[in-house]
Design a protein with these regions (language model features):
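Core segments of cupin and vicinal oxygen chelate
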Residues: 12-54, 97, 105
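Vicinal oxygen chelate
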Residues: 1-2, 34, 92-132
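A short, acidic/glycine-rich surface segment
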Residues: 40-42, 63-69
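N-terminal beta-strand motif that seeds the catalytic metal site of vicinal oxygen chelate
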Residues: 1-20, 78-83, 131-132
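Exposed loop/turn and edge beta-strand positions of beta-sandwich/beta-sheet ligand-binding modules
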Residues: 5, 40, 77, 111
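Conserved beta-strand in the GNAT
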Residues: 55-58, 126-128
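Short, charged/polar surface micro-motifs in flexible loops or helix N-caps
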Residues: 50-54, 60-64, 88-89
Length: 132
């Protein structure tokens, strides 16, 4: 077996609409209904610029085939989600306009600038800007 790429991250939340709005408004991800048997009331998928559903957002009441105890809020074993991005200055301005706490980091050896922020569920979001 060979892993080709990360497919998606799944976030379970009590605020489906607010979480989907966060990813759509701040990162420009396209919000779409998840495929059946999921419903618009229990799941939304966020698509990147290439049309990939990279973030799946499920309401706490959404049925799951393989389940484990999950509570909204602290993220258990998941520490962060990293996204490869463009538009560093625009993203930084949006965070400031929205009053969202964030931290910056640079890894000059590889030409990387990073912005870290939290989503509405306290999931740490790492935004990576290579050469931007």
């Amino acid at each position: 077996m060979r892993v080709n790429a990360l497919d998606h991250v799944n976030i379970i939340t009590a605020d489906l609409d607010g979480t989907a709005r966060f990813y759509a408004e701040l990162f420009g991800l396209e919000r779409r209904n998840a495929p059946p048997p999921l419903t618009p009331q229990n799941a939304q998928w966020m698509h990147d610029g290439a049309g990939r559903a990279i973030i799946h957002i499920n309401h706490v009441d959404c049925p799951r085939l393989f389940d484990r105890a999950v509570e909204p809020g602290p993220t258990g074993a998941l520490h962060h989600v990293a996204l490869n991005c463009t538009g560093f200055a625009e993203t930084l301005a949006q965070l400031k306009t929205r009053g969202l706490a964030h931290r910056l980091n640079e890894v000059t050896a590889i030409g990387l600038r990073q912005i870290f922020t939290l989503d509405p569920n306290s999931v740490l979001i790492e935004l990576n800007f290579f050469g931007d």
